[in-house]
């Protein structure tokens, strides 16, 4: 009798988890008993939502060390271990937070519930897949992968097992970007400039996948329309990949975006301007400020006649801390993350199309 009750409870719990999983934007698995056993294994994660989440960090480069720092400070997180093929670097960061260091990510597959994957982009797919196969939820630094095929495989695998994929589009958590939601209404023209001085650490991919993809994600989030056509140009000046690029994106709803990114600039700049009916909005990401210029019928002097100018400033905040806390919340509550795998894939698709345009142009130009 006890065995029958236990079996019934097992299946009911599994069924309940399936219903919860269907609410995740990362996927909607079919509610069939063929899936029960693999989902039942994840029930424990839901039951442990009030306990500390066991987290790991793979990759201790420039960004990885900050991921470790943020997790170590969270009261509801247990930073279990840090992995990096560079043994001395892994040990250095691990010692700082009194956790174990590993030279292979495979050594922590069975020790954690969630992981930040902060390795070079070409390794994103393989490392992420290994963790997903062990029922570990993943936060993958942007770009999600190097190809759409890899992104699709990760998304499909996560969907089938009710797992969470969050992509690290950090600017989503910038206070200025969050504030934009209250002011941006159907923009018709957008222009962005993301310029950076040269840094060797980010040259394993093109500037399109390294920097421009931030603005691609932001613009796509506000335009909410499919890209109809792309015209792009770019060239590698210092590295073997494209170091400076410009793209004109035309959306189905009529909006046009002119996007520029460079990692060989003499200065750092991260700005975007959005033009819409009766107003335009200028955002300085680096200084966390927004300038809103709106049409006005008020009879008063202004720098621009007939226009009101309002400037908003925001505290710098900690976008990475907010991003990681959002990931932890999504994992513990089993809810959709702020930037799902599908969202990361959408930005990647546009970025790869831009890269293809650049390659085609350069192939015909440098003959």
Per-range role (PLM):
Residues 67, 97-155:
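Beta-loop-alpha module in the N-terminal Rossmann-like domain of NAD(P)-dependent dehydrogenases
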Residues 21-23, 28-49, 114-117, 326-367:
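C-terminal helix-rich "cap/oligomerization" subdomain common to oxidoreductases
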Residues 145-202:
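A contiguous active-site-proximal alpha/beta segment in oxidoreductase catalytic domains
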Residues 170, 276-342, 346, 363-367:
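C-terminal glycine/acidic-rich active-site capping loop/insertion
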Residues 31, 36-97, 219, 328, ...:
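N-terminal Rossmann-like dinucleotide-binding module
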Residues 168-175, 198-227, 343-344:
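Mid-domain beta-loop-alpha active-site segment that forms a flexible
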Residues 17, 216-289, 317, 321-334:
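Contiguous beta-strand/loop segments that form the cofactor/metal-binding neighborhood of enzyme cores
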Residues 5-7, 31:
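Cysteine-centered motifs
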